[in-house]
Amino acid sequence: MSETLAYDVLRQLDRARRGDDSLTFTRSEDPVFVTPWRVARAGSAALGAIGLALSDLWQLKAGKPQAVTIDRHAATASLRSNTYVLQNGNKPVSWDPLAGHYATRDGRVMFLHTNHPHHREGALRISGAGEGTREALAEAVAKWDGLEIEAAIAGGGCVGGLVRSREEWTAHPHGVAVAKLPLLDIVKIGEAPPRPLPKGDRPLGGVRVLDLTRVLAGPTSGRVLAENGAEVLHIAAPHLPYQTEILMDTGHGKRCAWIDLRQPAGIATLEGLVHEADVFTQGYRPGTLAARGFSPERIAELQPGIICVSICAYGHEGPWSSRRGFDSIVQNVTGLSAAQGTLAQPRNLPVQALDYIAGYLAALGTMVALARRAEQGGSWLVRVSLVQVAHWIASLGTIDGAAGLKELPEAELAALLMESNGPFGHLRHLKPVVQLSETPAFYARPAEPLGSSPARWS
């Protein structure tokens, strides 16, 4: 059940069930959509844990808890939140036509992710495809053995993964390494005196969050913090590619600024922001920002008492820890896609559960770490990865997913949606899912394009 699983997650963070907790789940559990994986249970549990963490923060601020309600269908729909976005009545384009599954010479199947231009160009170049068509790429991939092209794509700084069964993945060296990790962890990385939560009329009011993330999981974490009162400043680099449609899904409540860390002025600007930040969330591969001088330990030196949050594809331990990856890739290499279809004809899940749940867990870890800072002091590091979420979902077992829906009934879906007007025009998108009795979640500002705001706190 979702409630039991929510408390299982919280117990991993040393937060036990309390007598004044009020956590209610409505509507049915799995299957909501057509999948054998228990994504409704997992998503609902993660959001339920967030609700209780918000209640804990409110109790620290206002002296009383809150009642939390989670609609399981809304929670499950939130795992495909990007598919519900409309901009001026139109659905933004999100997937490159070359992205997808390709057969290899030895009878395996390779998934290639080509949504970023440099990954697309790299996949064509490395595979030997002469032109940018699916037919040419399929012909090129068919000349490679599966493990060979997987290694070549990864070694070339591109993104792809070989479809594996659950059995093959659990025996893989990285699968073995990840199996030893918790779902998420929070570790103390520095000393600092206790710091009370900032004053404010919302659980995260007054909390300042630097959001240095790009693809879905990290931006989702920032959105959850923003909808509960945090001041979230999304920092992007002007020279890096970005999928604008992600902002229309996850940018609500945030301001967006440019900083170029290749320039000394950019480093100085970010250091200045860190000096006044409560949270520093980053979604780059392990070691990437550290090479620019922003390791968690250095950030904690700049701002004792800060909460650092690291979100990556493959975790912080194991042979693939520095490998590039996205939700769709991790689904395929860990066996989720093979179970959704077959090993020969894999299918990705109807939800991006790894991205969104990783984002929810990052937000949860942030909230728990803020409570620890208020009560114990210290600087803290929260670590979450897509592959750890995949292992968690797999651990919940499978069901007969054929009874699930391709889509929620129109009237039910309409009740989960909201509309906003802003720099992107007229947007339709999902409402916040976690319902709190005292401080309902809302977005204080509409989503805005990258670089719309100055790189400074309000």
Predicted feature residues:
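Acyl-CoA thioester-binding alpha/beta core of soluble enzymes
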Residues: 1-239, 267, 275-276, 296-315, ...
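Domain-scale recognition of functional cores that engage charged ligands
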Residues: 219-220, 230, 245, 261, ...
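Short, hinge-like loop/turn segments at secondary-structure boundaries
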Residues: 179-180, 250-253, 324-329, 400
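Active-site PLP attachment segment
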Residues: 321-338, 343-367
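Glycine-rich phosphate-binding loop and adjoining beta1-alpha1-beta2 segment
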Residues: 230, 234-261, 269
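Short, well-ordered alpha-helix to beta-strand connector turns
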Residues: 229, 253-254, 277, 326
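A structured beta-alpha segment of the ubiquitous adenosine-cofactor-binding alpha/beta core
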Residues: 210, 255-301
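Rossmann-fold NAD(P)-binding glycine/threonine-rich loop
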Residues: 291-339
